[in-house]
Design a protein with these regions (language model features):
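An N-terminal boundary/leader segment
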Residues: 1-53, 291-293, 463-469
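Small-aliphatic-rich amphipathic alpha-helix that forms the alpha element of a beta-alpha
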Residues: 364-367, 397-422
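Acyltransferase
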Residues: 20-31, 57, 247, 276-300, ...
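Short glycine/serine-rich loop segments
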Residues: 103-234, 413-434
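Short, surface-exposed loop/helix-turn segments at secondary-structure junctions
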Residues: 94, 98, 239-240, 309, ...
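A short helix-breaking turn/cap at a secondary-structure junction
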Residues: 192-283, 303, 449, 458-468
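Acidic/His- and Gly-rich active-site-bordering loop/insert found
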Residues: 52, 62-136
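Short helix-loop capping/hinge segments that flank enzyme active sites or metal/cofactor-binding pockets
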Residues: 71-91, 253-265, 314-366, 378-382, ...
Length: 469
């Protein structure tokens, strides 16, 4: 028997347009599952049940009136780092547990215009800084494939929701791997778009260009459709990506042709050791790419370890950008306080020198990579880790552990290139292990076309964790 949550985003949208499914019935189906299962996987911080029901009724009237929108009546939750007007927005922090957003972020406005329904705000770590989702406002986000293990972060709640069938897809964001990390450990497809593809406005500044919103889905085509909806700019955006040729959904239906793929599993952090399961996923993906006719070559990474301190300067500086009232500083978690202390000690010249060093590295490294259509790497150096693995040590060692877990992802936030996680591999113990594909600036289309080819050759959307049924 097929349940509503078995259907993809595109299938739900088509069923709504064809009046085979009601937006009200879809919303109620997910709200029931959320009520029963969400806390087990730590998916949501806030569930907007009344709003979802009202929006679903409005969508149903629009369908009956013959109105059209690409995602009319389809539920898509929003990560709790992004503002949705008149909805509680905690930023994953007890310091903001009672904050209500006063406006929509631009990406939320784009999702509204597409006709989506808001089920709620998904779980995120404090200010989105860690690569795991454990905070003081919601239960830990857990991968539905093993409830003892973390769903990653910082879009951990979004990935847990989609993998557990508590949303057909989700909005996420990625400033150092925060879409690719949780989609790897939850067995999903995720896109970190090109810098400037999706507006960061109107409130949150992105002075260093690391972070962007993006889709978290079960299928490549769903992600392409969501990216079409989420992409857009607004006055005041510092970065704007070149417009794509055609839609991203069209790219998913296009054969990629024979591509030149550079591959490396050497982390730019010498202390990081890539786990055999992650190497197995990487090697299997390499073999599949070769079988599909692509030219796969080993390459040397141009990203060197001496760049990491410069990235850490940016990361610690970003931790200071959220204005926390002085009387609420004590509510912050130890890692956040540690990063903010580091950030507040950084001088303006130090920050500018770090940005300059990273920009010089990008200017030197990108020409070496641009001779390849795609770069293949492990998404993570380790399989999913137990809940509590990072917090069982002090903040400084916690940050080191995060670096060793995620040595590959943040470089593409620095360069601004698009990158995706492709869920091609599961361990013998049933844990998902993703691989990462990165493309040229502005070329999400090639990544989407190649990922769709990989999905057709080795499908994954039919695989579900035990909690699914």
């Amino acid at each position: 028997m097929t349940h509503i949550h078995d259907l993809s985003v595109r299938e739900q949208a088509a069923a709504i347009r064809g009046r085979e499914l009601s937006p009200v019935d879809i919303a109620e189906h997910y709200l029931d599952r959320i009520d029963r299962l969400a806390d087990r996987v730590g998916a949501y911080v806030t569930v907007t049940a009344d709003l979802a029901r009202d929006q679903a009724k409005t969508a149903e009237r629009a369908v009956m009136a013959g109105e059209e929108a690409p995602l009319l009546g389809v539920p898509i939750p929003v990560k709790d780092l992004n503002m949705v007007k008149d909805v509680r927005t905690t930023l994953g922090s007890a310091a903001f547990a009672d904050f209500t957003a006063f406006t929509d972020d631009n990406v939320v406005a784009f999702l509204r215009q597409a006709g989506t329904i808001l089920l709620g705000k998904t779980n995120t770590p404090e200010f989105g800084l860690p690569c795991y989702t454990e905070n003081d406002v919601a239960p830990p986000a857990r991968t539905p494939w093993d409830l003892e293990r973390s769903a990653g972060g910082s879009s951990g709640g979004a990935a847990a929701a989609v993998a557990a069938g508590l949303a057909p897809a989700a909005h996420g964001s990625d400033g150092g791997g925060s879409i690719r990390i949780p989609t790897s450990v939850c067995g999903l497809f995720g896109i970190k778009p090109t810098r400037g593809r999706i507006s960061q406005g109107p409130i949150v500044p992105d002075l260093v260009g690391l972070s962007t919103s993006g889709p978290i889905t079960r299928t490549v085509r769903d992600a392409a459709l969501l990216l079409d909806v989420m992409a857009g700019n607004a006055p005041g955006d510092m970065y704007r990506a070149a417009p794509p040729e055609g839609t991203f959904l069209e790219a998913a239906d296009r054969a990629p042709g024979r591509l030149r793929v550079g591959r490396t599993a050497v982390p730019p952090v010498s202390a990081a050791q890539v786990h055999p399961d992650c190497l197995a996923a990487y090697e299997a993906a390499s073999e599949l790419l070769a079988e599909l006719g692509h030219e796969v070559e080993d390459i040397d990474t141009p990203w060197k370890e001496e760049l990491m301190p410069h990235f850490e300067v940016l990361w610690a500086s970003m931790a200071t950008m959220t204005p926390v009232p002085p009387d609420r500083e004590e509510r912050l978690r130890p890692l956040t306080r540690y990063l903010r202390e580091r950030g507040n000690a950084i001088t303006a010249p130090q920050l500018l020198r770090a940005q300059a060093a990273l920009q010089l590295a990008v200017r030197t490294g990108l020409p070496r990579l641009d001779q390849y259509d795609v770069i293949l790497q492990p998404t993570l150096a380790l399989p999913p880790v137990p809940v509590g693995y990072f917090d069982e040590v002090g903040p400084e060692e916690n940050f080191v552990r995060q670096t060793l877990f995620t040595p590959f992802t943040s470089v593409y936030n620095v360069t601004g290139q698009p990158a995706v996680n492709v869920p091609l591999h599961w361990t013998d113990g049933g844990l998902p292990i993703g691989v990462m594909l990165a493309g040229r600036m502005g070329d999400e289309a090639t990544l989407i076309a190649l990922s769709a080819q990989l999905e057709e050759a080795r499908p994954w959307a039919h695989r579900h964790p035990p909690i699914w049924d």
